[in-house]
């Protein structure tokens, strides 16, 4: 239970700090934008990132995602970081397979899901660029949180979840009436709990 309570603690910490900064800025005559818009009520992982730590998400999008090509083009660095991450993780998992096979299964499964998200996409060329650039952005965003393997894996999990959601959304568009689908009600909390502990 404590592991899942940590997701609430992270939100309260970050949102609380942001609200204090907004309040102090107002006392000095400055208006700062809202930094959290009830992210845990999001319909999907993409919307979550539009509502969570908006200043960081905007910075990552403007200065990392667009810099490595965004949806338009692929760059060396856009392909390099995800390839390096998956390659290093696979090498590590193979190296420790005498102790346990679980990291190897997880790594191969994550790589398979990432490739599958590209292969089943309606526009493969665009999704290759987009998914690799998004994965690079999330890996570097994880590294920004801390130079620790757990933050890099956290970034990779979010990059993978975003790639899967983008491909999934091509086949099952979001309802325009604002209501959450049954699938969204199941998958959103699952992705959040898995990636935030």
Task: Name each model-derived stretch.
Residues 1-197:
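Membrane-embedded transmembrane alpha-helical bundles that form the catalytic cores
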């Amino acid at each position: 239970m404590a592991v899942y309570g940590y997701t609430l603690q992270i939100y309260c910490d970050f949102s609380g700090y942001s609200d204090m900064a907004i309040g102090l800025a107002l006392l000095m005559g400055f208006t700062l934008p809202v930094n959290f818009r009830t992210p845990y009520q999001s319909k999907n992982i993409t919307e979550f990132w539009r509502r969570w730590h908006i200043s960081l998400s905007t910075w990552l999008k403007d200065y990392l995602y667009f810099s490595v090509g965004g949806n338009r083009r692929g760059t060396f660095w856009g392909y390099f970081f995800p390839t390096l991450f998956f390659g290093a993780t696979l090498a590590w998992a193979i190296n420790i397979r005498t102790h346990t096979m679980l990291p190897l299964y997880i790594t191969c499964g994550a790589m398979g899901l990432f490739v599958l998200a590209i292969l089943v996409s309606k526009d493969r060329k665009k999704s290759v660029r987009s998914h690799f650039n998004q994965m690079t952005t999330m890996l570097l965003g994880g590294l920004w949180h801390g130079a620790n393997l757990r933050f890099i894996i956290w970034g990779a999990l979010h990059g993978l979840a975003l790639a899967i959601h983008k491909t999934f959304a091509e086949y099952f568009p979001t309802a325009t009436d604002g209501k959450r689908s049954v699938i969204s009600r199941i998958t959103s909390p699952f992705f959040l709990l898995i990636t935030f502990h």
